[in-house]
Amino acid sequence: MRCRRLAYLWALVMLLTLSPANAAAKPGTSWAQAELETVVAVGIMAKAAAARPNTPLTRGELDTIVAGLTHTEVAASPSPTAKVTMAALDARLVAALGLTDSAKLFTQAAKTAGLAPLSRFGTEAVARLLGLRTNHPAGLDKLELSPGEPATRAEAAYSAARILHLGETDTQRIQELAASFVLPTVTPWQKKVLTTAVRFIGFPYVWAGESESKASPFGPQVHGGFDCSGFVWRVYKVEQYAEGGTLPEMLQGRTTYAMSGEVPAAKRVPFAKLQPADLLFFGAKGPKSKPAQVDHMGIYLGNGWFIHSSSYGVAVAPLSGWYEKRFAWGRRPLLEAGLVSPA
């Protein structure tokens, strides 16, 4: 029933998008202008609210959005004017899609591996696999939001518009991915590193970011968040691990190019030999890439999953498809620091 209702809304979205009046509309000023126009057109956000896209979203407004997406009565919130955090927005939308159980599977798998995930881990994993979050255009990092910050109407509109595009196959894919998210037994040091990594799920992608706050140890940044190499630095170089020895010294360069080039070719870890907490490097030519061609990186969780900071922010993803094709090589800082034994 939910899929038929979403299909009806999607048909309405397409009709409005292709109409002459909409085609002649003046370009908006919000990064999510198209999505704001969509949710107003289908009646799940008031035009007056959409006109102030950077205003914090209220519980009452979120209730209206969810009711519109699910074709149910608007729930009477006891605090309709209260603000909604980004984490709460994602959790509510994941629930509206009927994917709460899938979110629980992600969380339980991380708990079983001993990684002590935060309560938002599962819903943030699902929200990002669905594409409900996105990186803002260059120059707008100041608009990025951390999980505990109030969500804006623009963020809610983007997510709702994305949901209108989803079909039954999309939700089925999430259910299948959640069922496949089973992590291996890890060593004490792998557990330490991965526990740090999963703590940051849901933080936004911020260019040149390497801290969860503006006050980075390496200088101020526009907003708390990470780019792909900055996320790895935060986990491996900034975090203070008891008895970590030389671990922070293993990574010298800050970029993907530098970190991938610091490991000699003979010590690069191939795809089939990856272990939890290994660094992953990606390049356009896959294993034939040169360090200068490595343009993305992440941290391996195990059993075909990794965590990284991408256009969806800090998220987990399966190491398959596009990522498997572009996988260049891995690196094992824990071995370099003498904290794990050779395989």
Which ranges hold each PLM region?
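Bacterial N-terminal signal peptides that target proteins for export
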Residues: M1-W10
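Feature responds to low-complexity, polar/acidic, surface-exposed segments characteristic
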Residues: L15-T17, A21-Q33, V40-R59, D63, ...
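Non-catalytic ligand/cofactor/substrate-binding and regulatory segments of enzyme domains
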Residues: A23, H165-Y205, R326-A343
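Glycine-rich, acidic and aromatic/proline-enriched surface loops and short helix-turn segments
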Residues: T38, G68, A95, L99, ...
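Extracellular/periplasmic catalytic domains that process cell-envelope and extracellular macromolecules
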Residues: V39, S119, A125-R128, T187-K192, ...
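Aromatic- and glycine-rich peptidoglycan recognition patches
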Residues: A156, R162, L247-P248, Q252-S260, ...
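Catalytic cysteine-centered active-site loop
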Residues: V206-P276, G286-P287, R326
